[in-house]
Amino acid sequence: MSIRKTNPFISMANSYVMDAPEPSNMSYFWNFGSLLGVCLVMQLCTGMFLAMHYCSNLDLAFISVQHMMTEVNYGWLLRYAHSNGAGFFFMFVYLHMARGIYYGSYRKPRMALWNMGVMMFLLMMMTAFMGYCLVYGQMSHWGATVMTNLVTAMPYLGQAMAEFIWGGSSVSNPTIQRFFSLHYLLPFVIAGICCLHLLALHSHGSNNPLGMTANIDRMPMHPFFLFKDTVTIFAFLFVYFFLISYYPEYLGDPENNIPGNPLVTPAAIVPEFYLLPFYAILRAISSKMMGVLAMLFAILILFVLPFVDFSIIRGNAFKFLSKILFGFFCVNFILLGLIGAMHIEVPYIIIGQLATIFYFSYFMILLPLISILENMLFYLAIKR
């Protein structure tokens, strides 16, 4: 018998990569998992090399980044690979989650799989925010100031919590050191949850475009789906290296190339593009505390998704109304991202508020109602 089946360590990898039985009708929408795995490995590797040259001191942080760019061999490549890799990482996460929502991958028996994915998403946002602050450019400083100030919205303990995070009365040297420590640690926590995510996936197998149990029609992972994953990985790497070679600052903010100055406020404080939808939700509510809660619940509401979908059919492949509703949700999410980058003025304030209302209505009102309506139509069709 082959060593890949007899060796206790290799056989474990074999059961995931080689002989894993997968539904034969899986499309390219199921390739985002492998792309995310590649992104995670690249972020870990580039991050470790960057940490060797980074100095987590408020006065030296920006200088150390410029030192990497100009005096470290291929330091510019490492930095741009890491910063642009984060952008691709989030793009694939959003597409991965959109596919899961469309095809009902959050429903039983894959609820644990979905919940661990949402946990990873929450940790990713925390990690990305702290990493962005470590550059300590102008936008990094003010982004850290604005976002950490949101903690003060907490009743009674808010100011004390903010000062605990800052290590002083404002963003200062202890803040950068704490962010660096956590930014280095959290990716390994994400990698650990990713392993649990794979275990949960392996216990019930992958979903498929039809949303049906496909135990009678499966094929091994190798060579069919492994080759399909390889195609998209090479396509991604081509776009990725093209971007970091020719347009490395395209996804960033030029103002972050200026050293952080607490005495000069930028014209507009805007986070990275992958955090803009939730930033728009934060700004849509005038109350500071309610805005913070809305932004937090915009992520946590994904945990309740398995409980608000009452449809008897998994996925939207055969549900016309759900397809239309999901299309509106995707357009609304993109609109939130665009509004998050705009100045706080009319008509962007009103559009942001309407988009925020629709975002929460999709999960709490529209999805349950549409699923109940489609169940009724389904039963009526059976009786005929």
UniProtKB/Swiss-Prot annotation:
Annotated positions binding a ubiquinone: 202
Keyword Iron among UniProt keywords: yes
Subcellular location: Mitochondrion inner membrane
Transmembrane segments: 32-52, 76-98, 113-133, 179-199, 225-245, 289-309, 321-341, 348-368
InterPro entries reported in the protein's UniProt record: Cyt_b/b6_C, Cyt_b/b6_C_sf, Cyt_b/b6_N, Cytb/b6-like_sf, Cytochrome_b, Cytochrome_b_C_euk/bac, Cytochrome_b_N_euk/bac, Di-haem_cyt_TM
GO CC annotation, single: mitochondrial inner membrane
Complex formation: Fungal cytochrome b-c1 complex contains 10 subunits; 3 respiratory subunits, 2 core proteins and 5 low-molecular weight proteins. Cytochrome b-c1 complex is a homodimer.
UniProt name for this protein: Cytochrome b
Source species: Starmerella bacillaris
